[in-house]
Amino acid sequence: MSKIRIGIVGYGNLGRGVEAAIQQNPDMELVAVFTRRDPKTVAVKSNVKVLHVDDAQSYKDEIDVMILCGGSATDLPEQGPYFAQYFNTIDSFDTHARIPDYFDAVNAAAEQSGKVAIISVGWDPGLFSLNRLLGEVVLPVGNTYTFWGKGVSQGHSDAIRRIQGVKNAVQYTIPIDEAVNRVRSGENPELSTREKHARECFVVLEEGADPAKVEHEIKTMPNYFDEYDTTVHFISEEELKQNHSGMPHGGFVIRSGKSDEGHKQIIEFSLNLESNPMFTSSALVAYARAAYRLSQNGDKGAKTVFDIPFGLLSPKSPEDLRKELL
């Protein structure tokens, strides 16, 4: 059986993770890595070509699924619709407030090209989204709570790094214990965004940058920081590398509800990740398999995790899944 041919756009933490995840999936092979940098400066671990993104279009017949590994702030809003013109695509667009608009933009391109584009794959959005849905349908009377962390948010760190005057930055999302305990007890509290999480930022400034201006820009950034209590620490590059170079993350989705006669019922799904990008990458690769299969069946357009049957994610046959996992 021929392997699913994968291309990677962007070779940062996520791109490297996708490269590693492909090695764990024998039904797939990496064809090429596409970068905006000078390809000669990008060293990949696999024995594949590294090409400039401008050359990607010429590979439309050699790649079954293109996995887009750029950031959600500025990369994917352009790359998502662009690459869906030529390839089946997977991405991890994670700016929740903008997902409907992003979906529409990608869908327009994918419908026209006849390609399948699965957006916002990963763990949140992604696996957590599925568990929020599952909680709602199984316990229709109740409340859903999502807590993230403690961990490094790639999207938020990336957003800070794009601020003028910022050389490097890492952002931690921290669940507030009091809120978590109230939810787990079945209290069903009404919690504001600010009551559930805090955000802590460690920032290295460019020489001559104004700390007060940078801090204000961070704390007032819409969709990222404006609704949270945010603490900003300015530190040296050396301290950032020494103390904040890991990428742990995790969190949990809790559905707290009542069934007949007022019985308290709680569903909880949790993740504890040593490497956020490596885990997200594994999810992207699994959904690439589904995109390929949908495309083979003549499907097209943008999709989310809500539209993908779980069986399409697995390399196993439906018969094996029924026998082994059901």
Swiss-Prot record:
One of its GO terms (molecular function) is 4-hydroxy-tetrahydrodipicolinate reductase. This is Meso-diaminopimelate D-dehydrogenase. It catalyses: meso-2,6-diaminopimelate + NADP(+) + H2O = (S)-2-amino-6-oxoheptanedioate + NH4(+) + NADPH + H(+). The gene is ddh. It comes from Ureibacillus thermosphaericus. The enzyme is completely inhibited by p-chloromercuribenzoate and HgCl(2) in vitro. Thioglycollate, L-cysteine and Cu(2+) also strongly inhibit the enzyme. InterPro entries: DapB_N, Diaminopimelate_DH_Ddh, Meso-DAP_DH_C, NAD(P)-bd_dom_sf. Optimum pH is about 10.5. No activity is lost after 30 minutes incubation at pHs between 5.0 and 11.0. Its EC number is 1.4.1.16. NADP(+) binds at residues 11-14, 35-37, 69-72, 92-94, 121-125. It holds the Pfam family DAPDH_C. Keywords: Amino-acid biosynthesis, Diaminopimelate biosynthesis, Lysine biosynthesis, NADP, Oxidoreductase.
